Amino acid sequence: MGPRGTAHSVRAPLSWLLLLLLSLQVAVPAGALAETLLDAPRARGASSNPPSPASVVAPGTTPFEESRLPVFTLDYPHVQIPFEITLWILLASLAKIGFHLYHKLPTIVPESCLLIMVGLLLGGIIFGVDEKSPPAMKTDVFFLYLLPPIVLDAGYFMPTRPFFENFGTIFWYAVVGTLWNSIGIGVSLFGICQIEAFGLSDITLLQNLLFGSLISAVDPVAVLAVFENIHVNEQLYILVFGESLLNDAVTVVLYNLFKSFCQMKTIQTVDVFAGIANFFVVGIGGVLIGILLGFIAAFTTRFTHNIRVIEPLFVFLYSYLSYITAEMFHLSGIMAITACAMTMNKYVEENVSQKSYTTIKYFMKMLSSVSETLIFIFMGVSTVGKNHEWNWAFVCFTLAFCLIWRALGVFVLTQVINWFRTIPLTFKDQFIIAYGGLRGAICFALVFLLPATVFPRKKLFITAAIVVIFFTVFILGITIRPLVEFLDVKRSNKKQQAVSEEIHCRFFDHVKTGIEDVCGHWGHNFWRDKFKKFDDKYLRKLLIRENQPKSSIVSLYKKLEIKHAIEMAETGMISTVPSFASLNDCREEKIRKLTPGEMDEIREILSRNLYQIRQRTLSYNRHNLTADTSERQAKEILIRRRHSLRESLRKDNSSNRERRASTSTSRYLSLPKNTKLPEKLQKKKKVSNADGNSSDSDPDVGTTVLNLQPRTRRFLPDQFSKKASQAYKMEWKNEVDVGSVRVPPSVSPAPRSKDGGTQTPGLLRQPLLSKDQRFGRGREDSLTEDVPPKPPPRLVRRASEPGNRKGRLGNEKP
């Protein structure tokens, strides 16, 4: 096949996919999306009861006529819903791949903006072909299926310590700030509606307050999609993200409260107090349900060590169960799934295996990425249609009031909260927090959820909400990166914390806790220390099993150590049987057993001070995971093990050499067995041992006597061997250099012969050793003057030095 055929085969799947998607939308005007998102129960009823083969009747025949077996059939309605859902997910994934093929595009335009543009393009194509409104996103589908994976991913990988350290500021912005924006926008819009020239007099105060509550919701999906790309510092990121996560619960509560007030004919004082009580019940109840199911999930994973396959399943089941349970009781599902995810991250992670933990991370990232992509695409698709009503005054003033009240709320509330913060928020931080108030899918879903019977101007609310969403996502989302660079806002530090830094941080935590305890101040350090003690004493013992799973690196290290111990025992390097002499001196000692309290204390000390294998995720990223540090840890552990093996082998070899190479047992290997040494050498050996420093006790003496290192083997003539030894005896510091030959001061240099040799060898000494060998140990100083005329032996067993790893034979290199 030529190049043209190859290119055609590559382009064919994409073209067929687009043609198939468009043909399905044209052939089925209602669309599976309409049945799935707009009329899901009817679609489920139709798909769950397919026509049986017996009831299928061919066209043009009566029920009594016999039908023949067809060769090829097409039953698209039977697979319509899952088929189109698969195509939409595939299209969204291909769109994300296409965006990231050009690396500079996601840095200029956020991914959420590109996905909305794709949705607008598809919605325009569907609207132009069918001349009908494209299928809109049903709110139940958004709240029950698309939103939970995103919130679960955000809560599971949220840095818990910065979140709780800034919890007061986050709660202040989320609760008081949302009330500020909702009431301010609602009252301001009601004032605009009182102007008769705008034609908005039919919109009441409660309807404006309801619209203000839903339009003031800062969306975590939009915030994550934008803020993860600009890499602001961790404190600023956690403030904006935490506010967007918590104010959703406040927004939903206010939305339901004002919606109920709008449907009432008369509002009494009891209803107002009931609404305030409902506000606290919804938020606190959702948190309690999430924590409870998180504890149950951790307790369940204590018993999954024999069935590792189902460990990731419990994480997703319990988290989704917390969300739908909270929604069933009309509590905050977002708060429930966030609390459940943070609880499971602390306890479930300790029980599951490393492979299960990796599966949980990747599957959670995949679900959140797909859900986020579908949300933004459906926002673009649902925008195109006929369900809009335009009013310049209402739309423009809504956008202006959203920006004004957001900025005023951040600046006013920050001035109050800075009185209680150790590190106050600067003007740049306040500006970025106000600028990062992005609206998104939650506002879009809530405005579509309004009943048309109670709100006759629903289309106007939809149009105004879409304008605010598109302005914040496109204009603010695109310009926030250059604005952060222009203001020189502190960025996040991607450098991983070193061990010394972590130790010092823990040390300062304990110091600050002690200072707060002495001063009687109950700060966050005090409460963190109290919770840690309670956690170690009760919760961890109940929720985490004792034999915690270890990393594969630890398992490998354990196997290597066991193998090394077995090899040492088999080769006899470790003697497990004591000698009879040692048994005579052995005293029976009773070993006291440790109490359970002492064992717990030892475990606590080891758990605090030992090297931790699994590293926690310090920074959050939407689509990518942090680099795995197992390779670096494996390298570090293997280096430590090799070092320990070298130390053990060095000690064993040195001790064996010391026992074998003592001065009393050393002999010349070149001589026959049982051959006695000359008397003078034996006297010299006795003198060296008589000094009280034998080679066994003092290695330097043994080395001086018998450490005959390799040297140039030149056999001296008999007539000047004695004089040459006298030259060796002289000290090197009294020598002078003559050319390349060292001559003692009392000896004049002899003339050289033609062949380069010396004419009077008795008056000149040529060193037989190199400079390094001569000045290394000073072995020649200990030789005697009377050397036998025989040449020195070639192979000699030398006395070993502790820690010296040189060879034992004389012909080895030093």
UniProtKB/Swiss-Prot annotation:
Biased composition (Low complexity): 740-751
Subcellular location: Apical cell membrane
Disruption phenotype: SLC9A2 null mice do not develop diarrhea, have no changes in quantitated intestinal Na(+) absorption, however mice develop a sharp reduction in the number of gastric parietal and zymogenic cells associated with a loss of net acid secretion in adult but not in juvenile mice. SLC9A2 null mice also exhibited reduced recovery from laser-induced ulceration of the stomach. Double-knockout of SLC9A2 and SLC9A3 are not significantly different than the SLC9A3-deficient alone in diarrhea, intestinal Na(+) absorption, or reduced life expectancy.
Compositionally skewed regions (Basic and acidic residues) per UniProt: 647-661, 771-782, 798-814
Stretches assigned to coiled coil: none
Keywords, sorted A to Z: Antiport, Cell membrane, Ion transport, Membrane, Sodium, Sodium transport, Transmembrane, Transmembrane helix, Transport
InterPro entries, A to Z: Cation/H_exchanger_CPA1 (IPR018422), Cation/H_exchanger_TM (IPR006153), NaH_exchanger (IPR004709), NHE-2/4 (IPR001953), NHE_CaM-bd (IPR032103)
Topology of this chain in the membrane: Multi-pass membrane protein
Primary location: membrane
A GO cellular-component term linked to this record: apical plasma membrane
Family under the similarity heading: Belongs to the monovalent cation:proton antiporter 1 (CPA1) transporter (TC 2.A.36) family.
PANTHER family, alphabetized: SODIUM/HYDROGEN EXCHANGER, SODIUM_HYDROGEN EXCHANGER 2
Function comment: Plasma membrane Na(+)/H(+) antiporter. Mediates the electroneutral exchange of intracellular H(+) ions for extracellular Na(+). Major apical Na(+)/H(+) exchanger in the base of the colonic crypt. Controls in the colonic crypt intracellular pH (pHi) to direct colonic epithelial cell differentiation into the absorptive enterocyte lineage at the expense of the secretory lineage.
Subunit: Interacts with CHP1 and CHP2.
The name this protein goes by in its record: Sodium/hydrogen exchanger 2
Gene source species: Mus musculus (Mouse)
